[in-house]
């Protein structure tokens, strides 16, 4: 589905202009303040709305608006069980860590999570270790965010002849940097997004990130609620959607090439992605654009999906399917491991699965994921940083209530919207991460307001951007503060720190951009892996460090190390040894659960095998509160 006019593009450009304007205003805001505190924490001045929306917008990343919708689209209603505990994670994160982190960060002057660990355990080594681990995992986490944004840009601009020509020219000019197997329109969209987000993050700092998070938080919830209304209307109501889904069978996934009887004419032949075509009585849909280059007779293999449900085939072909300018040749088709030929699998757990005969979400795994999101969300360093930047306990209490409501208004509607997407946009199962922008166009055009697609697309774009800017800034702050200032040049001037921060932010953006040149099929798997890894590495050391006086440096190192080793090993066995996309789950429990338990055990063993902390540290972290500190 592509735009039929420029109205959605104009709306999207206006949104982007507002984001850049906020960065410019923010840059002026911190010129007369301490650079590090303002650039990386906004001078610790977050109020209720700012705290709730920057916390929520950062948490609601590409996983919420690309990976999560793609899994709903692929597996159906079982995703409601999968995401359920995300509604309570703000209570866990803000309630358990918020007050203590705020007090301690002000006492110690800490700006980053490694800052807290260095002050608590009097260990520069631990701070460097945590910085390195955070930087690696967050750089990996950024790849899905960049991928989603590039897919949105491709969907928004892909029908423009100028955009198509520039994309092809870019790949011709930079063949060494851009893989020839990559879709040039995707690559061009990726570079446009990277330029936008890196420029405004570098220029505006934490305050720009918070201001844009507030804007993006409103855009996200408004976009989701509008999509919910349009989706329910266009499928004829939830009862009708449920009845249709109960009759659906999972599709079959395969590849195809397209041939000509004679060489292609000048400029070649292009068949758009999402094009329907028939081979005999079988119905297929392309999931990638087809290019037959000038002077050639055959395209490269592209992904196609075969529709298997009889009523879907009848409905789609009722008005006829257009003839293709080339002949399709199907190379292979793969049935689902669970659900192939079965009706109703989208309506009940464990849901259909292309690779797992047990389905997507067996009961034990559903229980495991209820613990997963509460732990993973609480253990994210990006959330901890925001808990170091609010104004007082009253702000924290109100933000918790606001954020729980905010997540309810996003995640449950998303389940409904993208179950409806199986009826409104069938046949995208090979590239399900594109379902969000595709649905934005389908719903806005179906509602007779095509310009609204630009606003609806801004919701997932905002989710990716709000996560990217926060994570880039957090990596940059840890590198500048914990590596450069603390270990290399303690007497660095404000000017030097500013330019080192700018350069680091730019470098991180470049790394994530190159990583996104090879996008995975399911973004959510990367997000789950890296999000879980961050929680395993940081939740136990930080929580034990701020609440347990006996906890010491050896305990923190063993906690972090043993947790990550166990967590990574379970993924390694699944990914490499068993050649499976999913990790090994002993007793049906996710690796995060085992990693977190190992982290707690490692922390306990390391603590009691070595000595206690210094009196100075105990006084600083567990003594009387500062007279001016609001902890009421």
Task: Name each model-derived stretch.
Residues 1-632:
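Membrane-embedded helix-loop-helix hairpins and adjacent transmembrane boundary segments
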């Amino acid at each position: 589905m592509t735009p039929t006019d420029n109205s959605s593009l104009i709306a999207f450009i206006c949104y982007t202009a507002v984001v850049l304007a906020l960065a410019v205003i923010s840059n002026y805001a911190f010129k007369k303040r301490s650079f590090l505190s303002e650039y990386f924490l906004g001078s610790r001045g977050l109020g209720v709305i700012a705290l709730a929306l920057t916390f929520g917008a950062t948490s609601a990343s590409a996983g919420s608006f690309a990976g999560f919708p793609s899994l709903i689209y692929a597996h159906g209603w079982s995703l409601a069980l999968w995401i359920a505990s995300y509604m309570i994670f703000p209570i866990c994160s803000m309630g358990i860590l918020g007050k203590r982190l705020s007090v301690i960060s002000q006492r110690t002057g800490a700006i980053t999570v490694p800052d807290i660990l260095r002050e608590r355990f009097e260990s520069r080594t631990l701070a460097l270790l945590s910085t390195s681990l955070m930087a690696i995992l967050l750089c990996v986490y950024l790849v899905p965010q960049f991928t989603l944004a590039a897919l949105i840009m491709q969907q928004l601009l892909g029908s423009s002849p100028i955009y198509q020509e520039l994309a092809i020219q870019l790949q011709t000019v930079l063949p060494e940097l851009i893989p020839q197997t990559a879709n040039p329109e995707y690559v061009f969209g990726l570079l446009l997004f990277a330029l936008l987000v890196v420029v405004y993050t570098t220029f505006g700092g934490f305050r720009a990130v918070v201001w844009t998070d507030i804007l993006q938080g409103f855009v996200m919830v408004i976009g989701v609620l509008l999509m919910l209304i349009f989706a329910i209307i266009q499928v004829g109501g939830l009862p009708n959607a449920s009845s249709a889904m109960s009759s659906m069978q999972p599709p079959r996934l395969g590849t195809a090439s397209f041939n000509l009887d004679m060489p292609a004419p000048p400029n070649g032949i292009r068949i758009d992605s999402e094009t329907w075509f028939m081979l005999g009585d079988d119905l297929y849909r392309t999931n990638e654009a087809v290019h037959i280059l000038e002077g050639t007779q055959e395209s490269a293999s592209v992904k196609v999906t075969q529709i298997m449900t009889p009523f879907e085939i009848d409905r789609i072909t009722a008005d006829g399917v257009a003839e293709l300018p080339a002949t399709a040749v199907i190379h292979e088709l793969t049935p689902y491991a669970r659900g192939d030929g079965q009706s109703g699998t989208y309506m009940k757990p464990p849901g259909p699965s292309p690779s797992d005969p047990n389905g997507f979400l067996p009961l034990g795994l559903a229980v495991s994921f209820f613990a997963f999101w509460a732990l993973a969300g609480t253990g994210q360093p990006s959330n901890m940083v925001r808990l170091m930047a609010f104004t007082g306990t009253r702000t924290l209490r109100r933000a918790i209530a606001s954020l729980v409501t905010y997540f309810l208004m996003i995640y449950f509607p998303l389940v409904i919207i993208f179950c409806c997407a199986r009826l409104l946009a069938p046949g995208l199962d090979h590239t399900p991460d594109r379902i969000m922008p595709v649905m934005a166009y389908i719903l806005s055009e179906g509602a007779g307001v095509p310009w609204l697609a630009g606003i609806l697309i801004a919701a997932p774009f905002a989710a990716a951007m709000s996560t990217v800017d926060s994570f880039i800034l957090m990596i940059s702050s840890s590198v500048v503060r914990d590596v450069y200032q603390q270990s290399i040049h303690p007497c660095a001037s404000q000017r030097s720190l500013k330019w080192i921060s700018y350069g680091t932010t730019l470098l991180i953006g470049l790394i994530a951009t190159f990583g996104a040149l090879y996008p995975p099929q399911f973004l959510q798997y990367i997000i789950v892996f890296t999000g879980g890894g961050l929680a395993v590495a940081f939740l136990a050391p930080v929580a034990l460090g701020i609440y347990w006086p006996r906890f010491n440096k050896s305990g923190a190192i063993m906690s972090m190390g043993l947790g990550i080793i166990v967590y990574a090993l379970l993924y390694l066995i699944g990914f490499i040894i068993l050649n499976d996309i999913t990790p090994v789950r002993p007793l049906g429990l996710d690796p995060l659960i085992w990693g977190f338990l190992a982290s707690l055990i490692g922390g306990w063993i390391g603590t009691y095998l070595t000595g206690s902390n210094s009196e100075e540290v105990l006084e600083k972290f567990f003594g009387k509160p500062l007279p001016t500190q609001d902890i009421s």
